[in-house]
Amino acid sequence: MRAGVVVAARPGVEDLAVRAEELGLDSFRVYDTPMVHGDPFVALSLCAKATRRIRLGIGVTSPALRSAPAAASAFASLNALAPGRIICGVGTGNTARRTLGMGPTRAAGLEDFVTAVQDLCGGRPTAYREGDQVRDVRFLHAGAHVNTTDPIEFVVAALHGPKAAAVAGRRGAGLISVGLLDPAAWQALREARRNAAPDAPRGSCYLVTALHILDEDEDPHGAAARDATGHLVMSLLAYAADTPAAAERLGPAEREAVRRLLHRRSTTATAPDRYTKLYPGYLDRITPRDRDLILPELMTALALIGTPEDLRTRIATLEQTGIDELVIQPVTDPPTEMAHLAQLLA
C-alpha cells in the first residue's frame, strides 16, 4: 500500500514535504479550510518548488469556497510548477463551510464543479453559470501560465453516503474518506462508484486517518496515543456538537463527550455563533485539558493504534478491501511520525 501525509497549511510546510519525499512517501496534501488554516495553494506552491517527485494535493476544496474557473486556474498553475504531480481533491465542504456557519454543498453542485474543473484543467471549454447567465469559458492564457497538458488526478471526498461516490464514478475520479476503517463501508462506496458508471475509469482510493505505533507494554489509550489521534476524534465530536442530528446517532458515552465539549467551549448546539467556539484549533494537536474527551471507542473506530505487527495486519486487510493509499496527519512530531509511517509500510 502507498503512503502519504496531510497537514494544515502554514509557513514551513515545504520542509515537511521535502522530508516526506526523502522518506519515499507517495503524496503530500494540505487542507483547504480557510477560516482555520493557511492558504493551501500558497503552501503547495512552495512545496512544488522544493520537491521533485512526490505528488502534491489539496484535501479537499469545495465549490462553496471557490468558483470553478478560480479553482481550475489554481490547480493548473500548480501543475505548471509540478507537472503531472498534482491531486485535486474535491468535496462538499463539510468542515470548511461549517467554520463559516454555513451548510455544505449538495451532490449536484459538487458534480457540476468537478466537471468544470476537469474540463478547464484538461484544456477544454466548459459551461460557467452565474444566476441565469451561462457562458462557455476556457483558459485564454494557456501555455507558460498554466499546464493543461500533464494530467491532474481528481479525487472526490465521500464519507458514508453513496451520492458523492456516485459523482466520483461518473467523473472517473478516485475516492477519499476520513476515519473510515470499516471494510464493509469501503466496499459500499466502491460499489456506489462502480454502479454509477460501470464503464468509466476508476481512480485510487485514499484513507485518511491517524496513526500511533505502540511501544512495548504501552497503554493503547494513554496520553501519547490520545495526543497522536485526538485531532481526528475531536473533529468528529465538533461535527456532532455542531449537528444535533449527527449527535443523536452516537452512543451514550459519545453523546456525553459532545455535551462536555459544548460546555467546555461555552456554547450550545443551537447557538448561532457556535462555529466560532467549536472550530478553533481544528485538526491541530489537542490540548492536555481535552484528553478526557478522546474516548477509547472513538480512537479504535477512527484511528490506527497498535504494535507494528498488529498494524500491518490491519493495513493488509484494508488493502484487500481496495484502499490504495494510507494518508495520515502527523501532529505531535511530524518528521518522526512520517518516518514511522514509511518504516511501517516499507
Residue spans for each PLM region:
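N-terminal beta1-alpha1-beta2 module of alpha/beta enzyme domains
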Residues: 1-59, 152, 331
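Active-site mouth loops of central-metabolism enzymes
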Residues: 1-11, 61-69, 150-160, 211-214, ...
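Internal, glycine-rich beta/alpha segment that forms the wall or movable "lid"
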Residues: 72-203
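Hydrophobic faces of well-ordered beta-strands that scaffold small-molecule active sites
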Residues: 3-7, 28-30, 56-59, 86-90, ...
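Active-site-adjacent beta->alpha loops and helix N-cap segments on the catalytic face
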Residues: 37-45, 180-195, 334-339
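Short, acidic/polar
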Residues: 9-20, 74, 158-167, 307-317
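Conserved, mostly hydrophobic/aromatic
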Residues: 24, 47, 78, 117, ...
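An alpha-helical appendage that flanks or caps ligand/catalytic pockets
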Residues: 103, 107-144, 187-317
